[in-house]
Amino acid sequence: MRRTFSTAATAALLGLAAGNTAQAALFAVDSGPYGNDTAGFAAWYQDSHGRVLDLCLSKALSSRVPGTPDAPSYMCALLPEPGVFDDNEDIVFPGNFPSEAFWFTADAFIQQGGINLGYGAALEAAFNTEQPVDGDQISFARIRLRVDLTSAGSYTITHPYGVEVFEVTAEDLGTDGVGAINLTRDIGIGAPGDFSGALKGDVGPFLRSVNGPYEETNPDTGTLERFVGDPNLEEQVTGSPFGTNYLRIQGPNGLDLRTELFAVSGKLSTVQRPTPLIIQRSTYSRDSDASGATLQSQDLFVQAPPPPGLASFRDSAGASVEMTEADGTGHWYGQSTAAPTTARPLRPMQRPPCPPSWSTR
């Protein structure tokens, strides 16, 4: 049996502040029209931290990890498939295109003491028929867990995008414990050509290497491209909406294993997009102190790009109120003591660096 916690419950389990309970994973997607250069898929997705990732089809190679002719060290997650996609040839749609492509991937592994845990998060482009056929294009946000275990019991897995709890039985273990935990959660699959469903998935904001961004040259175009990570390396990352930039498994007999190393892929877009700003909660409270004086406050919680960006709001009195962000997750809070009025509603504003700079928070 598996229990997946809601975003609010996840925040509570992780001990986050009340204003951090809403996860705004992805913010926007390319609305088209969609051409053959992206095989009929959306060209980009934008997350709530403001980063925009293109569908990663570049054959740029890692300058940090050498590849081989049979296994090039691509910066994008390109998956050769006999009879479908030959990565030695030009990527062309239709004709020579992978059955799966990605805007973003993040993978991590834990192998210790009989535990073999594989984790994957992805924003994926695929086809309904599992073959690259025009008119069958779909996208989805995926969370995948595969765990081999040695004993039954209750297991909690914490990852950058949530918390999963599994009650593993002897029947789940079988004879060898292989695949005792087996979870694939795909969110966002809609009608072919509708790529908006993935905005409601569990993936996002995009994880990124603390050592990035990386720049590599596209061998086909000669242009310099920027990537959020190198999928050929395992590195520390940032970007979790809960601040859980790690993979952890806890279980029976004091089991507690953890890694902070991920292999991440994603190509930063040159598309310029408006800065994301999502109002999570706005409240007004009024009371009086012992002397009878009125105490009042307007409180505003928003999701926006974290520092070095800035956020503020204009209160009902017309004054600018600077907001604060405590943990690099993009959850901002501000308070004003002005009395509310229907004639002047709160007006939040976000001021990021322009262009958005790289933050390792």
Predicted regions and their residues:
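Short, surface-exposed binding/anchoring microloops in extracellular/periplasmic proteins
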Residues: L55, G67, A71-P82, D87-F93, ...
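Short, aromatic- and glycine-rich surface loops/edge beta-strands on solvent-exposed regions
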Residues: I157, F195-L257, A338-T360
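Extended low-complexity, serine/threonine- and proline-enriched intrinsically disordered segments
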Residues: K59-S63, G153-G188, A293-E325
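Extracellular ectodomain segments of secreted/surface proteins
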Residues: I115-I143, F262-F301, R361
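Non-catalytic macromolecular-recognition regions in eukaryotic signaling proteins
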Residues: F41-W44, V52-S62, A71-T129, G292-L295
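Gram-negative bacterial Sec-dependent N-terminal signal peptides
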Residues: M1-Q23
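Aromatic sugar-binding surface patches on proteins
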Residues: G83-F85, Q137-A141, T175-N232, A319-P340
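Boundary/junction segments of secreted and surface-exposed precursor proteins
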Residues: A22-L61, V65, A77, T275-S288
